[in-house]
Amino acid sequence: MSAKDVKFGVEARDRMLRGVDILANAVKVTLGPKGRNVVLDKSFGAPRITKDGVTVAKEIELDDKFENMGAQMVREVASKSADAAGDGTTTATVLAQAIVREGAKAVAAGMNPMDLKRGIDLAVEAVVADLVKNSKKVTSNDEIAQVGTISANGDSEIGKFLADAMKKVGNEGVITVEEAKSLETELDVVEGMQFDRGYISPYFVTNADKMRVEMDDAYILINEKKLSSLNELLPLLEAVVQTGKPLVIVAEDVEGEALATLVVNRLRGGLKVAAVKAPGFGDRRKAMLQDIAILTGGQAISEDLGIKLENVNLSMLGRAKKVMIDKENTTIVNGAGKKADIEARVAQIKAQIEETTSDYDREKLQERLAKLAGGVAVIRVGGATEVEVKERKDRVDDAMHATRAAVEEGILPGGGVALLRASEQLKGVRTKNEDQKTGVEIVRKALSAPARQIAINAGEDGSVIVGKILEKEQYAYGFDSQSGDYVNMVSKGIIDPTKVVRTAIQNAASVASLLITTEAMVAELPKKAAAGPAMPPGGGMGGMDF
């Protein structure tokens, strides 16, 4: 085990504070509509330009072990806020820095760190209660667009795209952000359920121009096993032929005699049929087939459930208004499933999302949820250069998470105003002793930091702006740093999602109070470089003849 370097008390906190300041100062220049860009060096390719707080925070690694510990703790604040609300990372970092600075001063002055922490916790509780009380539900499409615009740094085009996407796929729908191949940013919406499996044989194609299978008012057979024998399928095919409706088969695979018969029947026009492979693998495949069954009002045919294919009748098949299959994807639109069944399945998937600890599983569950609940929207971000596209994509990502958060918990006045107003409520918080009171005071001072920083980034005097905002009683009154005017923030469309503001203060206070209560730090001592090998003896060059 290598030797360790141990620091105590004031020295430990000072080194840690230096790291906090380096990271926070790099991140906070991005705050607000007039925030600046940060250029990140990449080991290969062009440098990356971003205005996203968490992206900057993740790049920072310091040489000094103790400073680095402080920086990494604050980086945790930014990434936790990004995970929970998808935005508000810079606000959280600014708040954490302000609380740590004031807290470190109080500890150095001899106050009890644990009482300071209790005071901070009491203050945060009161702030969150005030934010929730003043939160306003998002009702209109315009408000969603405003939230998106603010998060995308005042880019109203991005706000409008997000509002359109949410309108089309619903609040539960999946919105993905990709890089476009063109200069323009565009929105592409897939309604209904789409999965990434195409037709098994091109002979099933009905629209030769687009190389696509299109079927209206189709029956859907959902089978878990491979289909190779024709005998087990025959009774069902005869029943479907009599209805005159098309049939789509979703199975692990269709091969041999079964595939040949289906293709021949399709070409002779006796039966409109198409077959696709089942999506996913293993347990996820079973779950997705069950989703398709619930969406279409059919049954997943599985021998585990004791259902044999030869015993299947028409009532066990799913139905859909339209099914489209191309080489790579299958889309089922307007399935005939009962609304109550679909809602129950959605609730079940939501519960699984809450419980899962794996990011990959969560992402896959959210995809399944979207396919059941609404659809998938893809925003393709365009730009003149690769650097511009990446920077824009960062902003669209932020804005997408912010609009989701706004729909979930409502909105508050932006520009740091909601936190400023909440600081006024802390005067009435009751504490048990003076040290706890100081803890509350630390948070009260810190709550003005985001509004002050936004003003500083816009070239104004932060303290003057904060003073003027607090002079007015009106809750939504604040400073629009884009235009330089004092306005009603909500009616001007400068709004923040409640969830973003709430998680920012909770995460900042949580990590900051840990830093304040730190009394010792342990880091590995840098290893001394081993001495190099001795030089060979001087003289002639070895192995040479003269």
From Swiss-Prot:
Gene Ontology annotations for the cellular component aspect, listed alphabetically: cytoplasm
Q: Which UniProt keywords apply?
A: ATP-binding, Chaperone, Cytoplasm, Isomerase, Nucleotide-binding
Residues the record lists as binding ATP: T30, L31, G32, P33, K51, D87, G88, T89, T90, T91, G415, D496
Q: Where does it primarily localize?
A: cytoplasm
Single Gene Ontology BP term? protein refolding
- Describe the task this protein carries out: Together with its co-chaperonin GroES, plays an essential role in assisting protein folding. The GroEL-GroES system forms a nano-cage that allows encapsulation of the non-native substrate proteins and provides a physical environment optimized to promote and accelerate protein folding.
Return the protein name.
Chaperonin GroEL 2
Q: Source species, please?
A: Bradyrhizobium sp. (strain ORS 278)
